[in-house]
């Protein structure tokens, strides 16, 4: 392919932000007949430039590797351009070989970086994310805390039930104690009745004794009077006959009176004895009943007191057990809090290491992306060189054509789309402008 005198420019545009993004290369060709021929190719500020003037021609090539790059130029005269064409092509081939060597080095560095990233992920990735042992330990601790909480709740419920039972027994004890006091007051009243009955019996016995003594005294007086009367009658020796009817015998009358008094006294004694025995029997029965009730109340009070003491002992034991369980629960919670804090610190440390590792991976990915960008730019420049050297069939001899040709401008716009250094699509737009 031959070029007429004119200018030829190649520009490469690539969007930044994606490693696998496509490249769009725009080739613009404008060829004024009387102007000098120039060739410029590059990508991202790095490339080569060939310029040919009317009296002199400058040929320069610049190569950039990395972010900056180097640039070299070479100028030859119009008469010596053809003689130096071979040296220029050799220099370009050397530079192309240097580009290829740089690309191979970058590919090796890229492979090494990928291997380091995979090795770092294999070494540190699973250990930072493998928290299953800690989860099992935490689950066991949570289960122990839950079991202790349930045991504590069960003991609290038992203590409450014991407290309610103790309250019920206390109420029963108070009611039985009031019954006991009422029974004791009744017993005291019955004892007073017994004492009064005994006093009445003693009074009646004393009255009986006094009546017996009075009866004996009356009998003695009566006998004394009878004897005196008999003696008087015997000493007087007077016999009186009375025509009146014979009166009652005095001895018989006295005997009747004596018998009547004795029967009355015996009747009174029998009635008093029967009443006293009946009353004493009733009092003894009532005393026996009250004594039995008192004994039963005393037995029940003793049993209730014994039960209350046993419940108080059990309550104290439950309280001491509750206190010990609360202390154990506090110690367990403290240990669990310390373990949780240690595990949290360990998790934070592991998360920090994971974040640092992610930062390192991200930094290495950024470096890898930068190297990949450089590689793609170099591939674009290599493609430009290949297109300029092989595809376009450029010959430097065409630059020496007579500059006095018809002056016209033909603008050819070639748009190429590159993906990973390969031409995907290409379009050409030609516009001729006359001067």
From Swiss-Prot:
One term under GO cellular component: keratin filament
Residue numbers spanned by region Head: 2-84
Segments for region (Coil 2): 254-391
Ranges where the record places region Coil 1B: 138-229
Region (Tail) location: 392-435
InterPro entries: IF_conserved (IPR018039), IF_rod_dom (IPR039008), Keratin_I (IPR002957)
GO molecular function, one term: structural molecule activity
Region (Coil 1A): 85-120
PTM characteristics: Phosphorylated. Proteolytically cleaved by caspases during epithelial cell apoptosis.
Region (Linker 1): 121-137
PANTHER family (alphabetical): INTERMEDIATE FILAMENT (PTHR23239), KERATIN, TYPE I CYTOSKELETAL 18 (PTHR23239:SF349)
Other comments on record: There are two types of cytoskeletal and microfibrillar keratin: I (acidic; 40-55 kDa) and II (neutral to basic; 56-70 kDa).
Family: Belongs to the intermediate filament family.
Annotated protein name in UniProt: Keratin, type I cytoskeletal 18
Protein's organism: Acipenser baerii (Siberian sturgeon)
């Amino acid at each position: 392919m031959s070029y007429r005198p004119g200018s030829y420019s190649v520009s490469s545009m690539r969007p930044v932000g994606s490693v696998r993004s496509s490249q769009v290369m725009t080739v613009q060709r404008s060829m004024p007949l009387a102007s000098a021929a120039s060739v410029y190719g590059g990508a991202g500020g790095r490339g080569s430039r060939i310029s040919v003037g009317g009296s002199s021609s400058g040929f320069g090539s610049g190569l950039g590797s990395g972010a900056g790059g180097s640039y070299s130029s070479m100028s030859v005269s119009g008469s010596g351009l053809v003689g130096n064409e071979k040296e220029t092509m050799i220099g370009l081939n050397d530079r192309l070989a240097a580009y290829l060597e740089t690309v191979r080095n970058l590919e090796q560095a890229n492979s090494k970086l990928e291997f380091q990233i995979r090795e770092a992920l294999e070494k540190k990735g699973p250990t930072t994310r493998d928290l299953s042992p800690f989860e099992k330990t935490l689950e066991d601790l949570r289960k122990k805390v839950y079991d202790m909480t349930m045991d504590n709740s069960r003991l609290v419920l038992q203590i409450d039930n014991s407290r309610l039972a103790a309250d019920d027994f206390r109420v029963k004890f108070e009611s039985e104690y009031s019954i006991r006091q009422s029974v004791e007051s009744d017993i005291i009243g019955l004892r007073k009745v017994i004492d009064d009955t005994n006093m009445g019996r003693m009074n009646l016995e004393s009255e009986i004794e006094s009546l017996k003594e009075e009866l004996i005294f009356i009998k003695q007086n009566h006998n004394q009077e009878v004897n005196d009367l008999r003696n008087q009658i015997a000493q007087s020796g007077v016999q009186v006959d009375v025509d009146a009817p014979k009166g009652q015998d005095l001895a018989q009358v006295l005997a009747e009176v004596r018998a009547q008094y004795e029967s009355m006294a015996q009747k009174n004694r029998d009635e008093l004895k029967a009443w006293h025995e009946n009353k004493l029997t009733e009092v003894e029965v009532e005393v026996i009943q009250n004594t039995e009730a008192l004994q039963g109340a005393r037995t029940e009070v003793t049993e209730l007191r014994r039960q209350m003491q046993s419940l108080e002992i059990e309550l104290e034991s439950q309280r001491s057990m509750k206190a010990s369980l609360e202390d154990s629960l506090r110690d367990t919670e403290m240990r669990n809090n310390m373990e949780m804090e240690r595990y949290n610190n360990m998790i934070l440390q592991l998360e920090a290491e994971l974040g640092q590792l992610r930062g390192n991976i991200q930094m290495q990915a950024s470096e890898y992306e930068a190297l990949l960008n450089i590689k793609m730019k170099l591939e674009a420049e290599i493609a430009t060189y290949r297109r300029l050297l092989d595809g376009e069939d450029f010959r430097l001899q065409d630059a020496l054509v007579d500059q006095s040709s018809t002056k016209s401008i033909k603008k050819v716009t070639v748009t190429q789309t590159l993906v990973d250094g390969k031409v995907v699509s290409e379009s050409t737009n030609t516009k001729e402008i006359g001067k």
